[in-house]
């Protein structure tokens, strides 16, 4: 636990804060490129801002994602947001424990399932921990899964 706290508090000591560049080969866009529409179903999306009793939670599959994941993983909307109510947060930048609010969202609403999408960096473990705590404290048995994105934007094996 002490290491996690140090990682969250001290950006100079956290491996997730280390500056890196990724060399990528240019990608040719097909001539028939059609922009994909957003799959976002509700607003707000920030865990800190969403009301725990919002009507869109009723019967929802919930996506709880680290802020960076949508930037790192190119097909985020299609692979993760589509069909889900989306909440985002960053345990490193938001000086708050999400577990209490997430517990109330799970307790007060008819949530069908929970998917957590996090980055591979250690500090992102705080988001997974908050969701795990909320699932343990909500008084319900809900199906859930964790997906991890690499800093290179790849979906890692479970």
Where in this protein do the model-derived segments appear?
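Extended, compositionally biased low-complexity polar/Lys-Gly-rich tracts
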Residues: 1-2, 41
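Short, small-residue-biased leader/transition segments that mark boundaries at the very start
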Residues: 3-8
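Local cysteine-cluster metal-coordination motifs and their immediate loop/turn environment
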Residues: 12-18, 65-72, 118-129
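Conserved mixed alpha/beta catalytic, RNA-binding, or beta-rich assembly cores of soluble enzyme
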Residues: 19, 24-101
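Short, ordered loop/turn segments at secondary-structure junctions
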Residues: 91-93, 119-121, 149
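C-terminal folded domains that constitute the principal catalytic or ligand-binding module
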Residues: 99, 103-119, 126-147, 158
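Short, conserved secondary-structure transition motifs
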Residues: 149-155
């Amino acid at each position: 636990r002490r290491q996690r706290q140090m990682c969250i508090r001290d950006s100079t000591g956290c491996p997730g804060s280390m500056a890196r560049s990724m060399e990528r080969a240019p990608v040719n866009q097909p001539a028939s490129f059609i922009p994909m529409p957003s799959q976002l179903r509700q607003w707000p999306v920030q865990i800190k801002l969403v009301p725990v009793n919002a009507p869109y939670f009723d019967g929802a599959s919930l996506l709880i994602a680290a802020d960076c994941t949508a930037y790192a993983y190119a097909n985020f909307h299609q692979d993760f947001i589509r069909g889900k109510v989306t909440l985002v947060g960053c345990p490193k930048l938001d000086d708050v424990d999400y577990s209490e609010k997430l517990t109330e969202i799970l307790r007060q609403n008819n949530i069908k399932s929970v998917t957590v999408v996090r980055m591979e960096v250690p500090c992102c473990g705080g988001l997974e921990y908050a969701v795990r705590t909320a699932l343990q404290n909500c008084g319900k048995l809900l199906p859930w899964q964790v997906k991890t994105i690499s800093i290179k934007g790849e979906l890692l094996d479970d």
